[in-house]
Amino acid sequence: MKQTVYIASPESQQIHVWNLNHEGALTLTQVVDVPGQVQPMVVSPDKRYLYVGVRPEFRVLAYRIAPDDGALTFAAESALPGSPTHISTDHQGQFVFVGSYNAGNVSVTRLEDGLPVGVVDVVEGLDGCHSANISPDNRTLWVPALKQDRICLFTVSDDGHLVAQDPAEVTTIEGAGPRHMVFHPNEQYAYCVNELNSSVDVWELKDPHGNIECVQTLDIMPENFSDTRWAADIHITPDGRHLYACDRTASLITVFSVSEDGSVLSKEGFQPTETQPRGFNVDHSGKYLIAAGQKSHLISVYEIVGEQGLLHEKGRYAVGQGPMWVVVNAH
């Protein structure tokens, strides 16, 4: 398995393309100049395209991915109804979902043969919309509205329209600020990192009565932390055994172990990392974690070690200015 790491640096308007080898070392293979401040990125389900959101002219750009080395070639673009904060796709590669924090909306862009061709639906009134996360069954879109302390739930129709479910939302505690999400591989649990109180909520997708319920909330910060809380990103290993969340004020990544059924998180430790870690990701082997420092302008590669999933630094690399997003593609 070959792996390519993409790093988005909006201040220098670049994507750095790296080869990740089996020992966790990175080799720079390409630097792409992007026509705009590039922020969120996602790889298409078939691994043929990288979709990126740019501003100040709000667009989604599609780059064709070379199957041999992961190099990028521009392919298409499509306008968006707000500044792109987060970008994702459905599991079949039919739609791109874009959450916009500033516009307070989530949009759906239709894909034709992998290329974006236009917005088919927009839902407004989502104050602080920070991500759009498709459920494992490809039917429910979870959309955290950070400023409203709620996660809105939509059914995605066959033509890409979003229909509010019943119930239409789940709520966090007041002042939590739900931000980014991941799902357990067993498809029974979701995990949401809350920006404003730096916590992680565990959501059971279906209890015996068919409801969605928050079954655990854990603080991601050390006990003696008294500064402003400013959590950012969350990721889980492919085997579902280890979960990671980061905070930008403390510049740390918190390590959690996950119970076998996915219902319980246990805090295992803290890893100091790059200054202001806005984004990170886990590779497809589950052996390495790559974190980007928005203020250090560097990325660090860590090996995931032992039963606890603790992080051991393997190397640091210079990238563009203000790196914000990390994506790993296996090909």
Curated annotation (Swiss-Prot):
Modified residues (N6-acetyllysine): K287
Enzyme superclass (EC): hydrolase
Reaction catalysis annotation: 6-phospho-D-glucono-1,5-lactone + H2O = 6-phospho-D-gluconate + H(+)
Pathway(s) of this molecule: Carbohydrate degradation; pentose phosphate pathway; D-ribulose 5-phosphate from D-glucose 6-phosphate (oxidative stage): step 2/3
SUPFAM superfamilies found in the cross-reference section: Nitrous oxide reductase, N-terminal domain
GO BP terms: glucose metabolic process; pentose-phosphate shunt, oxidative branch
UniProt EC number: 3.1.1.31
Record InterPro entries: 6-phosphogluconolactonase_YbhE, Cycloisomerase_2, Lactonase_7-beta_prop, N2O_reductase_N, WD40/YVTN_repeat-like_dom_sf
Key words of the record: Acetylation, Carbohydrate metabolism, Glucose metabolism, Hydrolase
GO cellular component: cytosol
GO molecular function: 6-phosphogluconolactonase activity
UniProt cross-references to Gene3D superfamilies, sorted A to Z: YVTN repeat-like/Quinoprotein amine dehydrogenase
Function: Catalyzes the hydrolysis of 6-phosphogluconolactone to 6-phosphogluconate.
Similarity comment: family membership: Belongs to the cycloisomerase 2 family.
Family annotation (HAMAP family): 6P_gluconolactonase
Protein name (database record): 6-phosphogluconolactonase
